[in-house]
């Protein structure tokens, strides 16, 4: 079996968090295949308000975190089984994107207005995990996508800050398999992401359906044809992509990423 690996490339434009997340609209994730079969998972993190103290974080095996809970307190402790590295904002615990020693990568993406977490409950103290700590939690405990799904079934994910948007997540393993997690009306919904693209709102299944609006787009140049007694030809290469959206809304970025990658 051909050996596959995941390299996570993270391109940072600016960073913000918490209340500043209301100004953040542009995260785009793509997936590329190398000639040797390796999978490259890449993304942008484009936040408008400030850099908000973005930093690289290296977390060794056996490191212990405390889960944040609403109101500024701390909840359960969790200890990393695997070492991992990534990019965090504001403080080390709030990792936005990372990869562990097993090659599993995880990242969160802004997901306003369409997600809804379950309500925080003290009764779930031992299984509560805040949304902005889920990347760290998963990277420290899981090696495969199936393990991610099993681990998430054992926890309760709640909002870290009521002023912040909900988020959704992308998880990718060395085999190339990738999933998206969204929490809709308090329920975890998983999607197999064979396309390898993720942006923001609306939901992932809507973004896939929206690609049907661009079924006419093809690589290359449109062939000449006649219209009545006129002979028509394109102005140049790329004309078969005429109609590709050029704005920076999440649906348009999703379409561009899907066709360009």
Could you say what each language-model-derived stretch is?
Residues 25-126, 163:
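A contiguous strand-loop segment
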Residues 1-10:
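Bacterial N-terminal signal peptides that target proteins for export
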Residues 50-51, 109, 116-117, 179-182, ...:
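Short helix/loop capping segments that flank catalytic or ligand/cofactor-binding pockets
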Residues 33, 124-158, 247-261:
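Alpha/propeptide regions of enzymes that mature by internal proteolysis
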């Amino acid at each position: 079996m051909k050996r596959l690996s995941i390299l996570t490339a993270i391109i940072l434009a600016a960073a913000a968090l918490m209340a500043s997340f209301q100004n953040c609209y542009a995260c785009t994730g793509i997936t590329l295949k190398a000639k040797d079969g390796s999978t490259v998972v890449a993304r942008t993190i484009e936040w408008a308000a400030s850099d908000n103290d973005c930093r690289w974080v290296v977390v060794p095996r056996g490191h212990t975190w405390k889960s944040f809970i609403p109101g500024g307190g701390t909840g359960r402790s969790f200890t990393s089984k695997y070492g991992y590295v990534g990019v965090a904002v504001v403080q080390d615990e709030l990792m936005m994107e990372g990869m562990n020693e097993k090659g599993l990568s995880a990242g969160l993406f802004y997901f306003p207005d369409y997600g809804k977490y379950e309500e925080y409950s003290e009764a779930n103290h031992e299984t509560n995990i805040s949304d902005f700590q889920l990347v760290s939690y998963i990277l420290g405990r899981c090696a495969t996508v199936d393990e991610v799904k099993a681990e998430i079934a054992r926890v309760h994910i709640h909002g870290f800050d009521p002023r912040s948007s909900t988020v959704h997540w992308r998880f990718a393993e060395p085999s190339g398999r990738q999933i998206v997690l969204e929490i809709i009306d308090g329920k975890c919904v998983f999607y197999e992401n064979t396309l390898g693209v993720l942006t923001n709102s609306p939901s992932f299944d809507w973004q896939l359906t929206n690609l049907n609006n661009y079924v006419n787009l093809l690589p290359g140049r449109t062939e000449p044809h006649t219209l009545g007694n006129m002979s028509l030809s394109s102005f140049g290469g790329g004309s078969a992509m005429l109609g590709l959206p050029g704005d920076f809304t999440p649906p348009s970025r999703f379409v561009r990423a899907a066709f360009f990658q």
